[in-house]
């Protein structure tokens, strides 16, 4: 659920009180580096929006799973795909089929500038693009809320489970129930 568990503070020097919440200390050298509850929430909001958008596109295409994922730009070039999936930034997929496309926008722009036939083909594809306005999509909010959990509240991640141990669904439900009692 993204809550830094304060009950673990007695067991770990990395978890410290931070006002009404807790933080996870990465380094306590000359400058303390810590992950705060607000940091976790910001990641949750960003990844939930991305994942919800992906789910809307999957629904439009009437597909349940993806065979491959290409991540573009500097973000896609530097992120560890396993941890992107652990966070739930991307849907479950064979990790060998997730890769970086590099500077896809720059490459596409060069191709369009230097090759007339390619430019014509790109223009044809652009005319076929269908805009999906997430703000008016009925399922967006539901997908967004479900995607707030790490990696996801209801979607399974069988490919990810092959490389890391995921919490059991009962563990997730028990944690959610205990958080409801706190409020």
Region annotations inferred by a language model:
Residues 1-183:
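Helical "lid/coupling" subdomains associated with nucleotide-phosphate turnover
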